[in-house]
Structure formats: C-alpha cells, structure tokens
Swiss-Prot record:
Keywords: 4Fe-4S, Iron, Iron-sulfur, Isoprene biosynthesis, Metal-binding, Oxidoreductase. It holds the Pfam family GcpE. [4Fe-4S] cluster binds at C281, C284, C316, E323. One of its GO terms (molecular function) is iron ion binding. The gene is ispG. Belongs to the IspG family. HAMAP family: IspG. Its EC number is 1.17.7.3. This is 4-hydroxy-3-methylbut-2-en-1-yl diphosphate synthase (flavodoxin). It comes from Paenarthrobacter aurescens (strain TC1). It is an enzyme of class 1 (oxidoreductase).
Amino acid sequence: MTSVSLGMPAAPPPVLAPRRKTRQIKVGSVGVGSDSPISVQSMTTTPTTDINATLQQIAELTASGCDIVRVACPSADDAEALPIIARKSQIPVIADIHFQPKYVFAAIEAGCAAVRVNPGNIRKFDDQVKEIAAAARDHGTSIRIGVNAGSLEPGIMKKYGKATPEALVESAVWEASLFEEHGFHDFKISVKHNDPVIMVAAYEMLAEKGDWPLHLGVTEAGPAFQGTIKSATAFGALLSRGIGDTIRVSLSAPPVEEIKVGNQILQSLNLRPRKLEIVSCPSCGRAQVDVYTLAEQVTAGLEGMEIPLRVAVMGCVVNGPGEAREADLGVASGNGKGQIFVKGEVIKTVPESEIVETLIEEAMRIAEEMGEADGEDAVKGSPVVSVS
C-alpha cells in the first residue's frame, strides 16, 4: 500500500471575522466571552424533580459535546432538586427562572453555576436586582439576562407596540445598567426572537452598546428541520461578523440534536475544530453509482469517529476525481468500480461492491494513525455530513 502523509494544518483555519472583544465571565469551569471558545448549550426536557432522569439526560448531552446545560425551575420541588443536580452534573448547570424571584436565590444557594433571569416576567424584578447581585457575587454565580420577545415588560411593549429589535435591546440594556449600578458585571445577555431577521438586528444593535458577552439563540425555532435552518441562518450571520460567545439551538427535538446542530454550525465557520466530514455529490443523470446509498453506508460505518478527516463520496467523472483529490480520503466512482484517493493520490481501484468497505477500512487506519500521533482516542462523537 502506498504510504501517504496526512499531516495537520500548520496554521489555524481562517475565519470570516475576528471575535468581538468582550469581558469574560465564568459559567462554572467554562469561560464565556473574550478569547474563550464559543460554547454550545442545551436545556433538559425532563422534569427537574426527576433527578435521575435529568442527570441521565445531562450525561447524554455531555457525551454529545454539550458544554453548559440549563434546567427549568418552575416550582419549590424543582428548586429542592437543584443542589444534587448541580453537584453531580459533569458540566456547569444553569437554572432557568421565571415569575418567582425566590427561586433565583434558591438556585444561587444550590450551587448552580449560573442563573438565567427573565426580567420581563419575574415579579418586581428591578427591585430585586441589588439582592440578586449581592447573592450571586457571594457565591461566585454568573447571571444571564434573558430577554425574550414573548415576555417583554409591559412598559416596553406599550412604547414599541411589539417586540422590535429596539424593544429587545432597550430591555436588555436597562437591566444590564441595574446590575452594573450595584457593582455586578459577571453576566451575559440574550435578546431572543423567533424571527431570525429581527433577532440578528437586535444582537447587532446590542453588540454596539457594551462589551457584554452575548448568548445567541432563536427562541421557539420550531421542529428539527425548520429550527436548524433558522438557527444556522441567524447564527451564521452573527458569528461570521464576530458576534456571539455561546449558543443554544432551540429545536422541538431531543436535546442531543441541538448539540449536533450547534457544533456543526461552529465547525462550518471554523470556530470549532472540524471533525469527520462526509462530502457527497447530490447525484444527477451522470451518476454511475447509487450515491445516496453509498454516502449513507459510509456515514453509518464511520459513526462514532471524531477526527479532522474529510471523506468524499463522488458518483461520476465530472467533479469526482477533483473533489476526491481535495479530500483526505475519497472515491471517484464509475463503470462499476471506484478509484480510492488518499490526499490526492490514487492508492487502489476496487469493484463497486467493495467501495464502502474499503473507505471504512482506510478511514479506520487513518484514525488509528492520527490517534496514536495525538495520544487520544479518535473514535467518539458523530460524523459531520455535507452535500456538495
């Protein structure tokens, strides 16, 4: 077999814009803002009172690459569960608080890494800021000022008539000023809307008004497909301009799916190290093999590998050889056989029936070599799949 040196890039991959300069806060062990990597969050869907189920879901999220997790706290029973969850979680826990200010203090005392407060629906929130700031400071707890289009303060709604970008930003800046007035600066801000255009405009406006770390999110984004499109569109617009320090993809789907989408958005913008990527042509009348089946079988066979490896599955002679040469590993198919490329070099030609097996074997061999070089386990996570 021909020996091909894979190597690693000598310089970091290019990004579309430098990160916006912000202050840094800590959410437990995770830095948010400044030069900290952009983190990916999700929220549990289990009743917080079901401690075992909640911890199990947090473990699944952690394994999928989640950096920070949020749990709901709508009742006293939920608040009582927080100390155990915060202590046993593998990643920092944020308590999500609405309506009742007493649960903000309960979450802080429970040891949660951070608390999300909604100034639009917590009773007499402005009157509570001084005490919240003091408690958070004493316990080393950070705060997210979570402004949401669906729950703006009545005064703001009366002024603007609806949840405009200006309305969202005015609410956020006012609350930020209250915390800062009391000497508390360990907070980040979100201004969420379910319309990506309004959401992007609000974050762009907010980014000009202060150096606060920003939590990006499209609220109530919808089912998996629709929510993925909305989040990718909005996050891409902001992150490509350097705006955003932590993200949460909101989907009507299992929380693990939110992490997969969030990680892939960051990887596609070179804001997180790329993992395994399957590139496959969309197929057309020129295709001489079943590209869909080949791509699905290769993806299934490589599931669980986590290495910066691009695998191209191409179906004809037009773009096939060129695309396969550009990939780390690839196949250009035609006439009942496939040419296998590694780093631009043809290493073998195999019958069509052996393409999938050969690609998987070569990928596993490369993964082992890369794992040995890095001293790490290269088999974990899920592959990234794209269509060229």
